[in-house]
Amino acid sequence: ASYDGGAEAIAAAVAAHRRHGTTGTLVSLITADPDDMVTAIRGAVAAAGDDPRILGIHLEGPFLAESRRGAHDPGKLLAPDGAVLQRFLDAGAGLVRMVTVAPELPGGLGLVHALVDAGVHAAVGHSDAGYRDAAAAFAAGADIVTHAFNGMRPLHHRDPGIIAAAMDAGALLEVINDGV
């Protein structure tokens, strides 16, 4: 779930998760204008100060491939940009724990390095990366796949893509468990 409605909405969503057995969560924020994302990040920081079940923030965007964007607004997607990332990390006050990146984009691998250097999990997702680009991202320190098999090329014997690269690297595969 994405928590873009500010601290009150985040608190309500975390309470709903708690009622269903979730003991800890990352507040996931989706692609928006950078200023709006900074505002949302600050709202998540405020909510986390009041609730120890909020373990941090996951930025699922805006550094995503347009061709694999899913529900993300294509007009808000950005090329990987270290200065924009730094704004987000500064607003997160140490709570940004994970950022999803499409590593095949120009600057994508550099963003993976910047995330790893900042102690933030770099996740590969909403990406059209082939095996080589994905493997390079995992070699650079990316260690998670954002909702495996969704928003990426399918696993194919002639084009193994992100999933095979992640398995070769021992990366964590996050899945959407709707209906489970």
Spell out what each predicted region is.
Residues 87, 96-103, 108-130, 134-152:
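Extended, charged catalytic domains and RNA/DNA-binding interfaces, predominantly
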Residues 65-90:
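Conserved phosphate-binding/catalytic loop of the ribokinase/pfkB sugar-kinase fold
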Residues 11-40, 53-66, 92-106, 120-122, ...:
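Divalent metal-dependent hydrolysis catalytic cores, especially in the metallo-beta-lactamase
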Residues 1-7:
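Di-metal (Zn2+ and/or Mg2+/Mn2+) metal-binding site signature of metallo-dependent hydrolases
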Residues 133-136, 140-180:
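Active-site-adjacent C-terminal substructures of enzyme catalytic domains
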Residues 8-9, 40-43, 81-83, 157-163:
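Charged helix-capping and loop-helix junction motifs
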Residues 10, 14, 38-45, 85, ...:
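Generic structural signal for well-ordered alpha-helices
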Residues 33-34, 66, 72-75, 104-106, ...:
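Short, small-residue-enriched loops and turns at beta-alpha junctions
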